[in-house]
Amino acid sequence: GVVNEEFEIIAKATCKTNLPRPAEEICEDMAKVALEAVKNAGLEIEQIESVGIGTPGTANSDTGVIEYSNNLGFLNFHVVDLMKKFIDKPCYVENDANAAAYGEYVAGAAKGANDAVCITLGTGVGGGIIINGKIYSGFNFAGAEIGHTVIDPNGPQCTCGRHGCFEVFSSATGLVRMTKEAMFEDKDSIMWKMNEEDGKVSARTAFNAMRAGDKAGKEVVDKYIKYLACGI
C-alpha cells in the first residue's frame, strides 16, 4: 500500500505469494506490486520517499536481513539489498506484527498510548510490542514471536518443528485445518454445502456455519476461541 504524510493508505495492490519458490522471485513480485500500488495512487516512483517491508519471522531491521521465516522458507535473506535493485529508494524491513503494532500506535487503536501490544492472526500468529513509543525487538529480534509459544505439547506439529505452538491452533491456517477435520468427522455438517461452489474452506467457514446453527461449526469456533484465549 501507499501511505501519505498523514499515515493514510491512499492506494493498494496485491499478489499471491505462491509458495514454495525462491526468495528472489518473491522479492521481485513484491517490487512489482509496490510499483502497481504507486501507479494506482496516481503517483510516480520519484515521488515516493522510501519502501517498507513487513515480513513474518525474525527480521534484523539494522542489517536489512530476514534472518529466519519458517512460513516463507527464508533463511538469512538480504531482502533490503535485493529490493534496492528493483526500486532505487531507501528500504527498510521489519517483522510484520511489529510494523502493524507501530501502525496502530501512530494512527490506529493505540494512538495516544505509550505502551501497546498487538496480536496478528493470519498464516501464523504474530505479536508486536510498543514500549514508550518504540518497538520492542527483544533478543535476536524475536521478542514478540508469540506464535511459537507452546500451549499444548501434544498438539500438531508446527512449521517451526515443535508441537502445539500457539499458531498451530490460533492462526487462520490452523482454523482452516480444524474446520476440515470437523467436516470429515461430520458428513452432515452444513459446512460441506457452504463450499460447493469453489470447494475451498476458509477461516470464515466455521463462523458462518455456527451462525447458521451448525453444531460442528460451533464446536470448531469454541475450540479456536479456547486456544486463542489460552495463548493470550
Residue ranges and their predicted role:
Residues 85, 93-97, 151-189:
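Glycine-rich phosphate-binding loop plus the immediately following alpha-helix
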Residues 17-31, 35, 39-51, 57-117:
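Glycine-rich phosphate-binding loop and adjoining helix at the ATP-binding site
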Residues 1-10, 118-135:
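Gly/Thr-rich phosphate-binding beta-strand-loop-beta motif of the actin/hexokinase/Hsp70
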Residues 18-47, 166-169, 176-177, 181-232:
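Adenine-nucleotide phosphate-binding core of ATP-dependent small-molecule kinases
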Residues 5, 62, 131-132, 153, ...:
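Short, ordered coil/turn segments that flank beta-strands lining enzyme active or ligand-binding pockets
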Residues 13-15, 70, 139:
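Short hydrophobic alpha-helix segments
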Residues 142-145:
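Structural signature of FAD isoalloxazine-binding scaffolds in flavoprotein oxidoreductases
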